[in-house]
Structures are given as C-alpha cells and as structure tokens.
C-alpha cells in the first residue's frame, strides 16, 4: 500500500464488518469466522480483478482499486448485492460498512492522510448503520 503513487488515480476503500463482536459473543467464534470469510469472499469476488483486497485487522479490510476506476460505483453495487444475498450456515445475513477516497479528490500529503479520510467515512457509514438498525454498537 505504501508504494502507491499519489499522482496516479486509484481508490482507497476502508471496510469493516458490522456486528462481529455481537456475533462472537452470542454465538461463538465459529460464527464470527464464517462472517469474516464471507465478507472477504464478497470483497475478493467484487474487487480482485480491479485491485487488491487486504485484511488489516480482525474484521477490518482495505481494498485498493487501481484498474477500471470509472467502473468503481458499479463494483460497489456488485459488492453490496453479494453481501445482501449472502446467507450463511450459522448466520442469516451480514452487513459491511465502508468509506472510500479517490486519490484524485484533492492534493494529498501522504497515503496515511488518504487512509485516515477513508476510515472517517467508513466510521460515519458504520454510525449510520447502527442508528438505522437500532442496535447498540458497544454490544
């Protein structure tokens, strides 16, 4: 990721599973593992031919899109459909929050600044998800 060129066009996407702690606490880590694998599979099948998918934490992922940038919105819709249509062995559904930044949005000082902006957008998306769903995020 640190080798990305700030003068080229690419997209940085921060993604995070919603409700993983609740799933782990309520049903055990087998269920959490199923959700993490499913989210990764949805990301890979939606984005891999256009860039790379990285797992950067327990339920946190970064996607870097370097090809077909004009098709990015379509890639996101495909990803959202895959997540919405997924049904697991242990859990009925999953939800993933994301935020993204185009490298061309403005003059960035560093990739860290881009990742920070993307994370902030993802956390806003996550906050809205928990407000809409009525779930307590801390549980």
Residue spans for each PLM region:
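Short beta-strand-to-loop capping motifs
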Residues: 63-68, 102-104
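Residue-level signal for beta-strand positions within conserved beta-sheet cores that form or flank
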Residues: 8, 49, 92-96
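Active-site core of bacterial EAL-family cyclic-dinucleotide phosphodiesterase domains
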Residues: 13, 128, 139
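Catalytic core regions of nucleotide second-messenger enzymes
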Residues: 55-56, 83-99, 132-137
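Catalytic-core segments of nucleotide cyclases and related cyclic-nucleotide turnover enzymes
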Residues: 29, 73-80, 84, 102-131
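A structural signal for short, well-ordered beta-strand segments
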Residues: 12, 61, 96-100
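Conserved long alpha-helical elements within nucleotide-processing catalytic cores of c-di-GMP signaling
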Residues: 1-11, 18-48, 54-58, 62-63, ...
């Amino acid at each position: 990721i640190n080798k990305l060129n700030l003068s080229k066009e690419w997209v940085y996407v921060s993604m995070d599973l919603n409700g993983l702690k609740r799933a782990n606490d309520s049903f055990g880590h087998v269920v959490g593992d199923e959700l993490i694998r499913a989210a990764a599979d949805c990301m890979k099948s939606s984005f891999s031919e256009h860039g790379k998918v990285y797992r950067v934490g327990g339920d946190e992922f970064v996607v870097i899109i370097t090809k077909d940038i004009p098709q990015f919105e379509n890639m996101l819709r495909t990803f959202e459909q895959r997540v919405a249509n997924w049904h697991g062995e242990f859990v009925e559904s999953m939800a993933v929050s994301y935020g993204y930044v185009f490298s061309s949005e403005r003059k960035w000082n560093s990739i860290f600044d881009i990742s920070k902006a993307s994370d902030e957008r993802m956390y806003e998306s996550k906050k809205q998800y928990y407000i809409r769903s009525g779930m307590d995020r801390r549980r």
